[in-house]
């Protein structure tokens, strides 16, 4: 099977949104997701869910969208001029979780499908997605676990998949104007359309399903750790990097805004509170300095555990 089954993809994505929201609400134990279904005037719509002011999660947004249009925006055709003049559909689930506890990392995941069609010509389609982790106070055990899950889900699809998509993630989530990684990475892939539709779809499902396996054990380990104003202020400062990346560099944000997407859903990735501080430098040998020294530089986390891959 090499012709895309959009109904199959949509069913999976809606189920994935349900599963992730259910797991997050259960872990929070205090707040529930509110849902808003929306329609896009130019075509399509979506289902946005957000949890706010929880006991564990200050804000968690999990968005499903299925949008369509008669013509692609500049952000899409700039890199792929062959798509000009084609109608398109884009389906995806995207989520960003901003915990309250500074010892809990922010996490992001996204799985998506894109197809551009023109009468009389073959459709152009691909999958993309991934997940990445942004700690404020890093724990080696958590970083290894995160990457071990990523490695394991890639293995059935080939030995080369994890290192390739890990590097892509490290390269993509890099804040160029800060010369600094956004976090400790994970997986990132795009333009996936070979060897065939079902293989690509199966891999995309593995990534989507892998998110909870990667993130929820970290939530369970860290959500009860005590914290104070110092940790909170550092968390708010580091959230600024998240905002900078999403508004300046993230292709998905730019695509959404340029296609007339729903602004509230697109900017749901931004943290509810954030601060900037001129020329901040962490104290030498502090827990804050350890983030810059031990976690933000790119490294092979599986090698620490002595794994081969």
Swiss-Prot record:
Function description: Involved in the heme biosynthesis. Catalyzes the aerobic oxidative decarboxylation of propionate groups of rings A and B of coproporphyrinogen-III to yield the vinyl groups in protoporphyrinogen-IX.
PROSITE patterns: COPROGEN_OXIDASE
Principal cellular location given in the protein's record: cytoplasm
Binding site for substrate: 94, 110-112, 260-262
Chemical reaction(s) catalysed: coproporphyrinogen III + O2 + 2 H(+) = protoporphyrinogen IX + 2 CO2 + 2 H2O
Assembly notes: Homodimer.
InterPro entries: Coprogen_oxidase_aer, Coprogen_oxidase_aer_sf, Coprogen_oxidase_CS
Binding, a divalent metal cation: 98, 108, 147, 177
GO biological process terms on file: protoporphyrinogen IX biosynthetic process
Requisite cofactors: a divalent metal cation
Region (Important for dimerization): 242-277
Key words of the record: Cytoplasm, Heme biosynthesis, Metal-binding, Oxidoreductase, Porphyrin biosynthesis
Pathway it works in: Porphyrin-containing compound metabolism; protoporphyrin-IX biosynthesis; protoporphyrinogen-IX from coproporphyrinogen-III (O2 route): step 1/1
Chain positions of site Important for dimerization: 177
GO cellular component: cytoplasm
High-level lineage: Bacteria, Pseudomonadati, Pseudomonadota, Gammaproteobacteria, Enterobacterales
Family note: Belongs to the aerobic coproporphyrinogen-III oxidase family.
Pfam family of the protein (one): Coprogen_oxidas
UniProt-annotated catalytic positions: 108 (proton donor)
The protein's enzyme class: oxidoreductase
Subcellular location: Cytoplasm
EC number from the UniProt entry: 1.3.3.3
One GO molecular-function entry: metal ion binding
Full protein name: Oxygen-dependent coproporphyrinogen-III oxidase
């Amino acid at each position: 099977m090499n012709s895309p089954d959009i109904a199959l993809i949509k069913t999976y994505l809606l189920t994935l949104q349900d599963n992730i929201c259910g797991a997050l609400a259960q872990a929070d134990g205090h707040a529930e997701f509110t849902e808003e279904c929306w329609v896009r005037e130019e075509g399509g719509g979506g289902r946005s869910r957000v949890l706010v002011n929880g006991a564990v999660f200050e804000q968690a947004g999990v968005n499903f969208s299925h949008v369509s249009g008669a013509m692609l925006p500049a952000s899409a055709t700039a890199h792929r001029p062959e798509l000009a003049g084609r109608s398109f559909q884009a389906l995806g689930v995207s989520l960003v979780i901003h915990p309250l506890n500074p010892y809990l990392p922010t996490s992001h995941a996204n799985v998506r499908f894109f197809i551009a069609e023109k009468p009389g010509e073959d459709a152009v389609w691909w999958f993309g997605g991934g997940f990445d982790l942004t700690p404020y106070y890093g724990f080696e055990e958590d970083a290894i676990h995160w990457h071990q899950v990523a490695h394991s889900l890639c293995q059935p699809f080939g030995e080369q998949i994890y290192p390739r998509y890990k590097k892509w993630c490290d390269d993509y989530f890099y804040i160029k104007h800060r010369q600094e990684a956004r976090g400790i990475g994970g997986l990132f892939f795009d333009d996936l359309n070979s060897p065939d539709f079902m293989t690509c779809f199966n891999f995309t499902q593995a990534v989507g399903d892998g998110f909870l396996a990667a993130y929820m054990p970290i939530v369970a380990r860290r959500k009860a750790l005590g914290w104070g104003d110092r940790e909170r202020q550092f968390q708010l400062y580091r959230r600024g990097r998240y905002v900078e990346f999403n508004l300046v560099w993230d292709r998905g944000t730019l695509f959404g805004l340029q296609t007339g997407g729903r602004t509230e859903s697109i900017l749901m990735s931004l943290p509810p509170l954030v601060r900037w501080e001129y020329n901040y430098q962490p104290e030498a040998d502090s827990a804050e300095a350890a983030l810059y020294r031990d976690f933000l530089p790119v490294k092979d986390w599986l090698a620490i555990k002595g794994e081969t891959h």
